[in-house]
């Protein structure tokens, strides 16, 4: 396997050459292999999709507030839409059990979306400064849990139930 070198505040880290994630995601993969169950596991699809929805909404809100350029916002939205449409689900190698407030999952989404958005816009999109603008893992992750729960209830559980048997 070929690698590229990514840099962050902790220094250099080897990332698979074709991976859309960056240094912080790779560090989480390397340092926290807790369960072996990755974010690309089938039951996490709605969670990863909800991260894309949140990043899309944030990019549009930041544009409306004139905090980000139209070019960057559109590129982030395009990339985020691909994430919520499950086109890059294999780019989420983080273990489902992770430290803290889900920072690793949030950064994984930020890095994937930033790399896609950079490719689309030909302008450098920062995972922290652009994709994660006006957000915190403490807000993004609880929101993603709620959105993905709603998605799974409405798309999977409710259709599987025969609601005609319930008499209220």
Model-derived regions, located:
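Conserved, well-structured ligand/cofactor-binding cores
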Residues: 1-166
């Amino acid at each position: 396997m070929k690698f590229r070198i990514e840099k962050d505040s902790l220094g250099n880290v080897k990332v698979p050459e074709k991976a859309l994630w960056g240094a912080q995601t790779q560090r989480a993969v390397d340092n926290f292999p807790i369960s072996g169950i990755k974010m690309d596991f089938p039951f996490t699809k709605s969670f990863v999709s909800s991260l894309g929805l949140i990043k899309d909404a944030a990019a549009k809100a930041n544009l409306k507030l004139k905090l980000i350029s139209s070019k960057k916002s559109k590129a982030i939205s395009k990339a985020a839409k691909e994430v919520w449409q499950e086109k890059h689900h294999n780019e989420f190698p983080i273990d489902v059990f992770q430290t803290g407030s889900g920072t690793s999952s949030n950064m994984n989404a930020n890095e994937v979306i930033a790399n896609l958005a950079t490719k689309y816009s030909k302008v450098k999109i920062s995972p922290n400064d652009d994709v994660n603008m006006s957000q915190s893992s403490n807000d993004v992750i609880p929101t993603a849990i709620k959105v993905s729960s709603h998605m799974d209830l409405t798309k999977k559980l409710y259709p599987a139930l025969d609601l005609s048997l319930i008499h209220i």
